[in-house]
């Protein structure tokens, strides 16, 4: 059997062919549920507004090993720039092309196939295996994993270890696993002024001029030094808007959106206090609101990281590098429950781009890694 016809490749193609642009699922979870139900999983759909979620579990005892992931994908972008139609999975020169190939339908296929193989070999495995799948990871993440976790917490159902299938690898499969993520905090700031004619500045109050010294100081502030696991906290101004578009009107307000990616050396509360103290020091008239996107988390040495290191070495022959760089993932909603969380998935070079693709051989290797991890933890 060639790699093009491995079970993991066939399942990945079936998932990719479903145009599940967030928050749509387009039957992906039904397909997964059918495969899992056939090997003894209890399937629990959880529908919250426009979002399709699935909690599937095999076993009633702890520890609970959970595969976590998402069936939704980002929009395709300009279809004319794709070599092949984004929802018609195509293999070219050993790569599987299609939206979601790397992020993260390839991982979902590898999870299912690995679990099928594991259960066939070890029908009386220890503990429980679970799947937490959502169609709201690429969107506003309001009705997805966070709502499922709330449901599980309310009935005191705990996850021991969670493996998220996000594309963690950089140059080759398994070279990087994410064993933590920085926290994310967004500020939406409005600096108030008085609109007027540019020829009569004494009758107006320009919020851009007033805010400029504050923004300059904010952008130069030192927040912390990071630590051995996390880089220093960073702040980036993402959007600035002021004015009517006319050259002869002083704007009445300036809107600024900025985002922190912060380490465990600070808290969101400390960052908020420092920003608002700076606003007051510059004597600005302002409104500000804050969006908490996720707390930082870290999974150190222990059974999950040990099993993942071992699996990658056994399958690929090289050692992995645990890192906390990059954006946020749904792991940030699982970690606060006390679960240990890691991310392991394909190479991320083409995610969210046109011509997204994944190496076909990598999908089979990823399934093998997942299977070895299960064996290390539940046998």
From Swiss-Prot:
Gene3D superfamilies associated with the record: Zn peptidases
UniProt xrefs under Pfam families: M20_dimer, Peptidase_M20
EC number: 3.5.1.18
Disulphides: none
Any GO molecular function: succinyl-diaminopimelate desuccinylase activity
InterPro entries: ArgE/DapE_CS (IPR001261), Bact_exopeptidase_dim_dom (IPR036264), DapE_proteobac (IPR005941), Peptidase_M20 (IPR002933), Peptidase_M20_dimer (IPR011650), Peptidase_M20A (IPR050072)
Residues at which Zn(2+) 1 binds: 70, 103, 166
Cofactor: Zn(2+); Co(2+)
Residues that hold Zn(2+) 2 according to the record: 103, 138, 352
Catalytic site positions: 72, 137
Cofactor: binding details: Binds 2 Zn(2+) or Co(2+) ions per subunit.
Entry-linked NCBIfam families: dapE_proteo, PRK13009.1
PANTHER family in the cross-refs: ACETYLORNITHINE DEACETYLASE, N-ACETYL-L-CITRULLINE DEACETYLASE
Name the record gives this protein: Succinyl-diaminopimelate desuccinylase
The species this protein was found in: Shewanella sp. (strain W3-18-1)
Gene behind this protein: dapE
């Amino acid at each position: 059997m060639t790699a093009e016809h491995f079970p993991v490749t066939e399942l990945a193609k079936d998932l990719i062919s479903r145009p599940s642009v967030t928050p749509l699922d387009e039957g992906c979870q039904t397909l997964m549920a059918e495969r899992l139900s056939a090997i003894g999983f209890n399937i629990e759909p959880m529908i919250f507004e426009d979002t399709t979620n699935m909690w599937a579990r095999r076993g009633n005892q702890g520890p609970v090993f959970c595969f976590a992931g998402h069936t939704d994908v980002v929009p395709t972008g300009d279809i004319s720039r794709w070599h092949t139609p984004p929802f018609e999975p195509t293999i070219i020169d050993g790569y599987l092309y299609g939206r979601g190939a790397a992020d993260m339908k390839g991982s979902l296929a590898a999870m299912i196939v690995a679990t099928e193989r594991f259960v066939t070999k070890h029908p009386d495995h220890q503990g429980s295996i679970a799947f937490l799948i959502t169609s709201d990871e690429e969107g506003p993440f309001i009705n997805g994993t966070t709502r499922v976790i709330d449901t599980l917490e309310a009935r005191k159902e705990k996850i021991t270890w969670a493996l998220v299938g996000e594309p963690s690898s950089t140059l080759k499969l398994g070279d990087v696993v994410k064993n933590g993520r920085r926290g994310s905090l967004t500020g939406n700031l409005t600096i108030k002024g008085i609109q007027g004619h540019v020829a009569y500045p004494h009758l107006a109050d320009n919020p851009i001029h007033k805010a400029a010294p504050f923004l300059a100081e904010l952008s130069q502030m030192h927040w912390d030094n990071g630590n051995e696991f996390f880089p220093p906290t960073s702040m980036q101004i993402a959007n600035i808007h002021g004015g009517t578009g006319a050259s002869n009107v002083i704007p009445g307000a300036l809107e600024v959106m900025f985002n922190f990616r912060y380490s465990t050396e600070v808290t969101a509360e400390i960052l908020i206090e420092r920003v608002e103290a700076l606003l007051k020091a510059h004597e600005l008239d302002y409104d500000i609101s804050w969006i908490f996107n996720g707390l930082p988390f870290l999974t150190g040495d222990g059974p999950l990281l040990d099993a993942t290191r071992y699996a990658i070495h056994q399958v690929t022959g090289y050692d992995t590098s645990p890192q906390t760089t990059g954006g946020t993932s749904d792991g940030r909603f699982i970690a606060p429950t006390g679960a240990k969380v890691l991310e392991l998935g394909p190479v991320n070079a083409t995610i969210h781009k046109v011509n997204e693709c994944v190496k076909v051989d990598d999908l089979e290797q990823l399934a093998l890694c997942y299977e070895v991890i299960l064996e290390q933890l539940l046998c």
